[in-house]
Amino acid sequence: MYSLDFLASKLDGEVKGDKNVEIKKIATLSQAGEGDISFCTNPKYLKALSETKASAVLITEEVLEFCNTNAVVLSNPYMALAKVMELFDKSPRPDGKIHSKAVIAASAIIGENVTIGANAVVGENVVIGDNVYIGACATIDNGTKIGNDTLIKSNVSIAHDVVIGTGCIIHQNAVIGCDGFGNARDEDGSWTKIPQLGRVIIEDDVEIGSGTTVDRGAIDDTIIKKGARIDNLVQIAHNVVIGRNTALAGVTAVAGSTTIGDNCLIGGQSAITGHISICDNTIIGGASNIGKSITKPGMYYAAFEAKPRIQWGRFVAKLAKIDTLITKVKQLEEKIK
């Protein structure tokens, strides 16, 4: 429980109303009640703002006139919300306890205030920094290094010689450093596996979602740069480089040896081919199929939106005739000339 005045001081915001009101939890405008703090970041919700029963809201000066309760006025309510949610977050944190059923190699170096859960396995020559949390059944293979203040949640699998920076979060069932999809085909059609000798390097302040896989490099390293955000069920193939502060939404797949620049946003279910580059500050819409390099910043979209079945059928039928139509247009152009 926090006073509104305390929260405002943490947010560099200005209280409008009762600064002593007590805040117990966070809620949406429509669901909030006494003791709740809410937020409004979208003009679509001004009616909900005016009707909310929240004890306080996070808003900008521009919408203050629609607010009928206590408020903290600031320039970026959404960022303020993130900071308030950190205060109320009950996620596991390191407490220095190592479970008796954890298996830790004698050569591993464990920092101060590290938590290691039941049935977790820490391999030979692993280095774990201070204030690290390792959840139950996580596995950390030989030679891996994990920086300070990183959270490795339950059932995460980290392969050998991976490097993870400080302040990272890796969610349940993610797999980091598995073999990339490298095979050589013989003349008779049979496959020979190519050993994957590179590493995965995850820089500071990176978050990786549940069920995501990041393959180790074949020769060069796979690199996730500082501040990147990767959602659930994303596939990052070998030798890929993800730039600083770039975000990839769920079910996206990035094929091998592709480089994505800094500050990019990749929509969910996108498929990005291998051996291309995407420049800084690129936005790719959801379900897009990117087959060649992007060299100019901007917004790109390459997917069909859902349509009623009959309308879609007509569209496909017309699309099948487009070559014939182009030929006819060219013939007409020749006649006009």
Curated annotation (Swiss-Prot):
Listed EC numbers: 2.3.1.191
GO biological process: lipid A biosynthetic process
PROSITE patterns documented for this protein: HEXAPEP_TRANSFERASES (PS00101)
Gene Ontology cellular component terms for the protein in this record: membrane
Keywords in alphabetical order: Acyltransferase, Lipid A biosynthesis, Lipid biosynthesis, Lipid metabolism, Repeat, Transferase
Pathway(s): Bacterial outer membrane biogenesis; LPS lipid A biosynthesis
SUPFAM superfamilies: Trimeric LpxA-like enzymes
Catalytic activities: a UDP-3-O-[(3R)-3-hydroxyacyl]-alpha-D-glucosamine + a (3R)-hydroxyacyl-[ACP] = a UDP-2-N,3-O-bis[(3R)-3-hydroxyacyl]-alpha-D-glucosamine + holo-[ACP] + H(+)
GO molecular function: N-acyltransferase activity
Location of the active site: H238 (proton acceptor)
PANTHER family from the UniProt entry: UDP-3-O-ACYLGLUCOSAMINE N-ACYLTRANSFERASE, UDP-3-O-ACYLGLUCOSAMINE N-ACYLTRANSFERASE 1, MITOCHONDRIAL-RELATED
Record function comment: Catalyzes the N-acylation of UDP-3-O-acylglucosamine using 3-hydroxyacyl-ACP as the acyl donor. Is involved in the biosynthesis of lipid A, a phosphorylated glycolipid that anchors the lipopolysaccharide to the outer membrane of the cell.
HAMAP family: LpxD
Oligomeric form and interacting partners: Homotrimer.
Protein name as annotated: UDP-3-O-acylglucosamine N-acyltransferase 2
Organism: Francisella tularensis subsp. holarctica (strain LVS)
Gene name of the record: lpxD2
